Amino acid sequence: MRNAQKPSGMPVHRYMPFQDQITVELPDRTWPDKVITKAPRWCAVDLRDGNQALIDPMSPARKMKMFDLLVRMGYKEIEVGFPSASQTDFDFVRQLIEGNHIPDDVTIQVLTQAREHLIERTYESLVGAKQAIVHLYNSTSVLQRRVVFNQDEDGILDIALQGARLCKKYEETLADTHITYEYSPESFTGTELEYAVRVCNAVADVFEASADSQVIINLPATVEMATPNVYADSIEWMSRHLHPREGIILSLHPHNDRGTGVAAAELGYLAGADRIEGCLFGNGERTGNVDLVTLGLNMFVQGIDPMIDFSDIDDVRRTVEYCNQLPVAERSPYGGDLVFTAFSGSHQDAIKKGFEALEKDAAAAGKDVADYTWQVPYLPVDPKDLGRSYEAVIRVNSQSGKGGVAYLLKNEHSLDLPRRAQIEFSGVIQKRTDTVGGEVSGAQLWQIFQDEYLPSSKEDGQWGRYSLGSFSTETDDDGAMTLHATVTVDGVQVRRTGSGNGPIAALLSILGQDGVDVRVLDYSEHALSEGGNARAAAYVECAVGERVLWGVGIDSNTTTSSLKAVISAVNRAIRDAQA
């Protein structure tokens, strides 16, 4: 097949391939052969890196709500602000400490640039804290060295080392606070690896990194510049060359400029990282920080405990939306409104069959469905494990088929339609969606079903030519049955009698008196619930003249439900003929 694509005409000559800017060579890479088996150390940076990117930065009340959420979910390292950058951030750090809001097993993290007055102010904000991470950073990339700082490699290294020494100096003012240091060569992805490791190792030496006093070296994709495999190669290269490696906690801080932040984090973790920084639902500058929800639940669906509680994902989303004053996208993995929703007919049918197989397999294994291995097509996770219901799993539009329609009727109304009846009713729905367009809600679908198959509940409703009233039966010695029934025909109530080898056959005899030729082709019934007051649903496939249609009857009496189903099929056939 010929490729008909043509040049775009866009100014591609203005952009430089990454490999022409930064060299990352690792022919003996080992990360592709590894698999993730446990969760990393997490650090949530919503309150700083996320907050700085908001149109309306969080108020103190919204910050506290976000902090409480992160603690409740199980995050043990939380970046809470840049206290030397604003009075608001300084005051919030003080509020957390003085108000005793920080659990003993949670470590707050504060950010600072490598300037003495900023570092001094940072340490002032931490007075009284039990433990804290002081996060020092300066930019090291080729572009920022040239454009922003107008400094060579040695000049940028001096900035980092001066900042590290000042941190150690002011640490002496916090005798009762255990300080862990973190250093980030900002814009790491735009920095030569040999230079990045030179700076990081020099800073780690000043911080006296050791197995007993580890230093966090954080390698940010401040701007995502290449494919995730390149980021992973750079992380493995750094992991091999950082020293002392046992004294280093290697941390990742991916952004999502190319849309692959999650993949970069996962591959970077395989490549030797120990820790990942990010935000819930990927908030952050430009296209955002890496999404901690996606990362954590990607592990969960692989049978790995993320060490974070996502069991009420809707509450997490609502809180994040309130605090950030930004919506979470409907297609956002795991948390969006539509992520567990199937509109496609083939998808719906597979999901329906998957649920049925799951129940069957769990019963055969003697286990509750909630404890059985989850395997349902198109649903990588059980929505109930995230606090969701199955209500929105299947929704109906013009792309839907019988599986989705049948699923909704069964789950919302306990109606288990026979396969051919499913096909027939899905055609009714398809005709409606093709005509009107849009989605058919569960309530609308039920209304359409009632209008099509069941007697109208409205006094002035015109359901069809026939309506069944009270009846009685008699059985003679030969087993033949006589049906005495009150039937409404064209709005007029009449008393009719018919005979046959059962109640349905007797009703067909009555209908035959009006010249209505009916043959029953298929029949099934089931209870709609359990207990003495349970109602039954009956489904009857009838040939009425040249038309083959299904009827449905619902009643607390099984005989009545079957007779109603025949009337339903006959009325539908007559309506169809008149149309």
UniProtKB/Swiss-Prot annotation:
Name assigned to this protein: 2-isopropylmalate synthase
GO cellular component, one term: cytoplasm
EC number: 2.3.3.13
One Gene Ontology term from the biological process aspect of the record: L-leucine biosynthetic process
Keyword Magnesium set for record: yes
Catalytic activity: 3-methyl-2-oxobutanoate + acetyl-CoA + H2O = (2S)-2-isopropylmalate + CoA + H(+)
Gene that this polypeptide is encoded by: leuA
Provenance organism: Arthrobacter sp. (strain FB24)
Keyword Amino-acid biosynthesis recorded: yes
Quaternary structure and interacting proteins, as annotated: Homodimer.
